[in-house]
UniProtKB/Swiss-Prot annotation:
Bilayer topology: Peripheral membrane protein
NADP keyword on record: no
Cell location: Cell membrane
Gene that encodes the chain: MSC3
Name of the protein in its database record: Meiotic sister-chromatid recombination protein 3
Functional note: May be involved in the control of meiotic sister-chromatid recombination.
GO biological process terms held by the UniProt record: DNA recombination; meiotic cell cycle
Biased composition regions of type Polar residues, renumbered to the chain: 343-368
Keywords: Cell membrane, DNA recombination, Meiosis, Membrane
Region of interest (Disordered), residue spans: 75-136, 251-291, 343-378, 458-479
Cellular component terms per the entry's GO annotation: plasma membrane
Length: 834
């Protein structure tokens, strides 16, 4: 059973050393291990062969390839039964290695087996063989890497063994990386290279007494190039190297072709070396001469270039001459292999040195030319001329005729200035101006460019005209006195212009006012401000008498209104005239209102203790009489919405007059107020305020004054509740005069009665068809001046209730009349009387 079979010990595969015994037929097989598969004499069969299914490494310098097709030495092995189904290294070839474990010494080389990969696949179906055939159809692939003591990979060997019907096809691919040992600084070869000199000029490798190569020689074989042993391969390699050198020489010849630098001098860091074509010959002669005598010493007296001794010292400038060195040779046999290697090393080094020297010389030519010139100091005159020329080019660009001429002459000479150092002595290249480029566009006939140029010219001309800046060349530096005088002159001029303009305006207005005989309709255009546009839609015209807005000064004959701004001063400015007319119109409206109020005061009987006066509520701003503008009863045809809202707000806000207006309103104490005939002075009746008790949430009892409900206290406007105001005077201390409208429409005054005192019977009151009281709010405001709208309405309701008690109207009718009067008085206050 296969599971109970004991697993044999695996033996390492030593086939990676097969290429070492290639082309060595004289080696005794008794001293070296020869695999039984190769018959002991076919050592070159596994040397170096290319793989069929794998591509060689393109970076490898040498690839050896050999193909071998060998018949099995034991044909009867194909008829043996299979030795288990485990795919391991237990093959006939591997088990035979156990009889002899001797291996050649590897010296100092550290050989490491990187990876071993075995792949065995049955090809019975492909070849049409039987199933019970032994495991002879298989493929084995082995990959081995060899590294040196420094850890660098020296070679990679891939061996593929294909067993088909008793035949073995061995394919071995060896990829080697040639690393030549670097020479020391004193020119000696490395210690591991045991080179000797003989009469024929060739050197051989050292052998031990027992006829076996030394471990060092064995290691050198791993380090060397295995392709060099083949004559055909060596010829191909030499041809490739020669072609590479010729390519380098051709490149260097093209780089050296510079007519401007043919006679350059040698740099300080450059060495005196012979022509480059003799480098290889001199190197071979020196190497042959040094090894010509057996055991003799020869001193190298020639001057050796630094680049040939060491590749590291090409950047070292410490020594320009290398001292002579001494070499010792040992009498040994010769070998063609090492001589070929030495000859091969000289040729690539020659091309490498040539390329390095040429690049160094080519890169330093410009630096030598620049350092060869010596700077000479400029005189003051030369420095001034150069500075002046540069300044002209910066300021005037190409406007200077001389510069333009030079640019025209040099336009066809396109000389490259890259890499040249600019000095003040050299003539600077003239840049192409914008005018030249625009001329070129004009010649091409581009319409778009022409339009762009015209727009640019127009903008430039506008900027030059608007700024009017004098040229900088004509400016002078002003002293402090001159600057002060100029500033004073400018200030005086501005002041005189302003004064003359004002005087001319006033004089023209005076002349126009004097020459105007009759007022003429104004035809001058008037500025339509925000007020005019806003109030035009609210003008009402009811075909009644209108107030003339024209000023007393009349109109100018030219068409502009002459408005009197101050006593004896008029103006024709439409804006000023408009403002003056508006102010005068508002003043006339106030006078008319005050006249109406004074008329109401004359008919009303003042209450006891009230400051009654026949003067208007507001003192007139003008000294002219009221009758000069309008009659007391003449209604106003035009009301401005702003004035209406302001007046309505003041009436509901409880407007308080200023001190001067208060003094004008108070009548002198010596002039007692008199009432018209047929009326009597009513005495004020003090009625205590009713109070009601309320219980708080903590059980305490509080007494609050019984006032009207909140619905009665609500104002028609929001001004009263949103702004602080003074408390109005109680109605119990004021005797109101309420004007009522009779059926005939005449105004009569009746004293207001209180709940405690029954007034005299009032005549029948009617407004329209319903017999309801009509409250004149203007009369109430004229009498009190600060009594709110709600208080007057409440007092009117009390008077209506008293009238109803005497037989006039019922309480229900009085209440209805009060609500109706509120709405009508609000509309009448907002849009004027009707």
């Amino acid at each position: 059973m296969g599971f109970l079979t004991k697993k044999e010990r695996r033996v390492p595969d030593l086939s990676r050393y097969d290429y070492h015994y290639q082309n060595k037929p004289a080696v005794d097989s008794s001293k070296y291990y020869v695999p039984r598969e190769y018959g002991g004499k076919r050592l070159s069969a596994s040397a170096a062969a290319a793989a069929i299914y794998t591509n060689p490494n393109p970076n490898a310098t040498g690839v050896s390839r050999s193909y071998s097709l060998m018949h099995s030495y034991n044909p009867a092995a194909a008829r043996q039964p299979p030795a288990g189904r485990t795919y391991s290294l237990r093959s006939d070839r591997a088990s035979s290695i156990t009889s002899n474990s001797r291996r050649p010494a590897a010296g100092k080389a550290q050989v490491r087996r990187a990876s071993t990969q075995q792949r065995r696949a049955s090809v019975d179906q492909e070849l049409g063989t039987g199933v019970n055939q032994p495991r002879t159809n298989s493929i084995t692939v082995t990959t081995t890497k060899v590294r040196d003591p420094q850890g660098r990979t020296k070679s990679i060997t891939k061996k593929t063994v294909r067993r088909i019907n008793g035949y073995e096809v061995v394919e071995t691919t060896t990829t080697t990386t040639t690393t030549e040992p670097l020479p020391t600084q004193n020119g000696k070869m490395p210690a591991n290279m045991d080179l000797v000199s003989v009469e024929d000029g060739t050197d051989v490798e050292e052998e031990h007494d027992d006829g076996l190569p030394s471990p060092q020689a064995h290691f050198d074989e791993f380090s060397g190039d295995f392709v060099a042993e083949d004559d055909l391969s060596s010829e191909v390699l030499q041809h490739q190297q020669q072609q590479y050198i010729e390519d380098i020489v051709e490149e260097e010849t093209e780089e050296e072709e510079d007519p401007g630098h043919t006679g350059t001098k040698r740099l300080p860091g450059e060495f005196n070396e012979p022509p480059r074509t003799n480098i290889a010959a001199r190197r071979s002669n020196s190497l042959t001469g040094s090894l010509s005598s057996l055991g003799a010493k020869k001193t190298i007296s020639e001057e050796v270039p630094l680049d040939q001794t060491s590749s590291v010292s090409k950047f070292s400038d410490a020594m320009e001459y290398i001292p002579p060195t001494t070499t010792t040779a040992k009498p040994k046999k010769s070998n063609l292999r090492n001589s070929m290697t030495a000859r091969k090393l000289a040729q690539p080094q020659q091309g490498q040195n040539q390329r390095r020297t040429v690049s160094f010389t080519q890169g330093s030519i410009d630096h030598m030319n620049t350092t060869k010139k010596k700077k000479q100091p400029l005189t003051e005159q030369e420095m001034y001329l150069q500075a002046l020329e540069v300044a002209k080019k910066k300021v005037y660009k190409t406007d200077d005729p001389a510069v333009v001429g030079n640019a025209a002459n040099n336009s066809n000479k396109r000389v490259s200035t890259m890499g040249k150092r600019m000095t003040l002595r050299d003539s600077a290249p003239v840049p192409r101006s914008s005018s030249m480029m625009m001329n070129k566009f004009h010649d091409q006939g581009s319409a778009r460019n022409n339009v762009a140029q015209q727009q640019t010219d127009v903008r430039r001309s506008k900027s030059m005209t608007g700024s009017a800046v004098p040229p900088q060349a004509g400016k002078k530096k002003l002293t402090d006195e001159e600057m002060y005088e100029k500033a004073l002159e400018i200030a005086q001029k501005r002041y005189n212009d302003l004064v003359s303009a004002d005087t001319a305006a006033v004089g023209a207005a005076s002349v126009g006012a004097a020459s105007a005989a009759t007022p003429v309709a104004s035809t001058a255009p008037k500025k339509s401000g925000f007020k005019q546009r806003f109030t035009k839609t609210f003008h009402t015209d009811d075909n009644k008498s209108k107030i003339n807005n024209a000023s007393a000064g009349g109109m100018v004959s030219g068409g502009a209104a002459a408005v009197e701004v101050a006593p004896g001063v008029t103006t024709t400015d439409p804006v000023v005239a408009e403002n003056v007319n508006e102010a005068s119109q508002i003043e006339r409206m106030d006078n008319v209102e005050m006249a109406s109020a004074s008329a109401a005061n004359e008919y009303a009987a003042p209450a006891a203790g009230f400051r009654a006066t026949s003067a208007p509520l507001y003192q007139s701003r003008s000294a002219e009489p009221v009758g000069a503008y309008a009659a007391p009863d003449a209604p106003i045809s035009k009301y401005k919405i702003v004035d209406k809202i302001l007046k309505f707000a003041q009436s509901n806000y409880g407007y308080q007059a200023h001190d001067d207006e208060e003094a004008a309103m108070v009548a002198p104490a010596s002039a007692p107020a008199t009432a018209p005939a047929g009326t009597s002075m009513a005495q004020p009746v003090v009625v205590p305020v009713e109070r009601r008790s309320s219980v708080g949430k903590h059980g305490n009892t509080t007494t609050l004054p019984v006032e009207t409900p909140l619905a009665d206290n609500a104002s028609e406007s929001s001004f009263r509740h949103t702004h602080p105001q003074e408390q109005p005077v109680p109605l119990s201390q004021i005797e109101k005069k309420i004007s009522v409208v009779s059926e005939t429409g005449s105004r009569k005054a009746a004293p207001a009665a209180t709940a405690a005192k029954t007034p005299a019977t009032a005549p029948a009151m009617s407004y329209g068809t319903a017999k309801t009281p009509f409250i004149d709010i203007d009369a109430v405001d004229a009498l009190s001046g600060h009594v709110p709208f709600e208080e007057a309405t409440r007092h009117a309701s009390v008077a209506t209730a008293a009238t109803a008690a005497t037989g006039g109207t019922t309480g229900t009718a009085a209440t209805t009349g009060t609500g109706t009067s509120k709405k009508k008085s609000f509309l009448r206050k907002l849009f004027g009387r009707k």
